[in-house]
Regions:
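A common structural junction motif
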Residues: 6-9, 216, 320-326
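Active-site cofactor/substrate anionic-group-binding motifs, chiefly glycine-
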Residues: 3-23
Length: 355
């Protein structure tokens, strides 16, 4: 599909059935509604854009109430308070860094309040003496006072990882079922598609967001739409999604499969017959990275490399490999974690031979 859209004609904004101008969003809107049971959907170019346009539409020049402990910063130093400022909203933070109660939200509501916002801490976690208000509690308050509730999931996911023995991560479906009016999340990261910002929720609010002039500036292009549509189609069958989407496959790969990969890489490295290197298969811990699942430890296998060359020198050589192999250094040893290596990574391995 992706290659076809790139090479040939596309019905991006042409309704083939009616023979007139159509909507570019229809290509993914129906699938998103089918998978998540959302009333309506809109896709923009990234999640920061999704948050920006949602806030600008629902709360321009009005107050948005959010917990102090949820004023997150994502990659590149982009912060929720700054996104809110550029959306033209008035930030009203409540609670403390570690504890926010329902009464904090309720006591902060004024005639100028337009939105209750909850932000998922997708790239960090606060532990210890903590308290946060659940989505369900906030939705109940929103209904009581007549205010919409928005949830920014950040790296949203469609699959319940706890079914596979991993730590629970809120799914998009669960958040919608809790009754939020708007939920925003990324099309890449845990979803495994191209970069995009997905907005789901109540039709009355999504329709307002669609009419916002910012939608034109943030709109998604045809190649991204094609890639996202192909990704979403896989989610009609969870097993198919896990089998074909690299991010899901890498997170959920079995320990036995990882050990097989490690043995194969060890064999390929030994075949190089390098005098100044020693290789050893060790057990290690993988992290997901990419602003998702910050506290999840995934048991993995790696090749530990010892050599007269410094770990930094070996690391640089592998980065310049074709294709590049990304490694890490622990306790002055170079580790090649096999979890994220594709089969093509083994075809040509380059290690330093001269100082």
């Amino acid at each position: 599909m992706y290659k076809r859209q790139a090479k040939y004609y596309s019905n991006l904004e042409f309704d083939l059935k009616e023979g007139k101008r159509g909507s570019r969003y229809i290509h993914v809107e129906e699938i998103l509604k089918e998978i998540t049971e959302a009333e309506s959907a809109l896709v923009v170019n990234n999640n920061a854009g999704a948050v920006l346009i949602s806030l600008n539409t629902l709360a321009y020049k009005k107050e948005v109430i959010v917990s102090r402990g949820e004023l997150v910063e994502i990659g590149g130093s982009f912060r929720i308070p700054e996104v809110m400022k550029w959306a033209g909203c008035i930030l009203k933070e409540v609670g403390t860094t570690n504890k926010t109660h329902l009464f904090d939200y309720e006591n902060a509501i004024t005639e100028n309040t337009a939105l209750l916002l909850k932000v998922h801490k997708s790239n960090f976690e606060i532990t210890g003496f903590t308290k946060e208000v659940s989505v369900e509690e906030l939705v109940k308050l929103g209904k009581k006072v007549g205010l919409p509730v928005m949830k920014d999931l950040g790296s949203g996911c469609f699959i319940d990882f706890s079914k596979y023995g991993l730590k629970k991560e809120p799914t998009v479906q669960e958040v919608l079922k809790a009754g939020v009016d708007i939920v925003t999340f990324s099309g890449d990261k845990l979803l495994g598609g191209p970069q995009a910002g997905i907005i789901l929720g109540k039709k009355e609010f999504i329709e307002k967001i669609k009419r916002n002039p910012l939608n034109r500036a943030l709109r998604i292009d045809k190649l991204t739409l094609a890639g996202l549509e192909a990704t979403l189609r896989l989610y009609r069958d969870e097993i198919l999604a896990i089998e074909h989407l690299p991010i899901l496959k890498m997170i959920l790969i079995s320990k036995e499969e990882l050990k097989k990969k490690a043995r194969y890489l060890y064999k390929k490295l030994k075949e190089l017959k390098l005098k100044d290197f020693e290789f050893k298969i060790i057990e290690t811990i993988s992290k997901t990275g990419g602003g998702a699942l910050p506290t999840l430890d995934l048991t993995s296998y790696a090749i530990a490399v010892n050599s007269r060359f410094s770990p930094q020198t070996i690391q640089k050589a592998l980065r310049e490999n074709e294709p590049p192999i990304i490694t890490r250094i622990e306790e002055n040893k170079l580790l090649i974690d096999v979890r994220c290596l594709f089969a093509v990574s083994y075809t040509h391995l380059t290690l330093p031979t001269k100082a």
